[in-house]
């Protein structure tokens, strides 16, 4: 089963007639890397923001986004924060510390992760950069 499943997602911004997303379906399995490519205004950011309910834009939505079979919108915010990460297009809008290590540790620290576990997870993440 796909970890993230988007099924027939259609989204229309308020005051617009044309949907920004129309009948989008996508499966992403754990460990996969996915690149969304398209012109400016084609809906890439709008789609990604629907993976993180606190960032989802307001408007008319049909379809469903699930994580391991559960609608993302039904997950408690703490679970969403622990399981769903989001890197914005402009890093200046999201960087909160002045050191890469601290930036990688920020989310884990906010969740109360034990120091030893946090160090191991940050080291693991850092190998990708």
What are these regions (language model features)?
Residues 71-85, 110, 115:
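ABC ATPase NBD coupling module
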Residues 85, 92, 98-109, 119, ...:
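Short helical segment in ABC ATPase nucleotide-binding domains corresponding to the A-loop/adjacent helical element
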Residues 37-40:
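The feature captures the beta-strand-to-loop junction immediately N-terminal to the Walker
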Residues 114-129:
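Conserved ABC ATPase "signature" region
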Residues 1-6, 11-23, 55-58, 74-76, ...:
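A short, flexible loop at the N-terminus of ABC-type nucleotide-binding domains that lies
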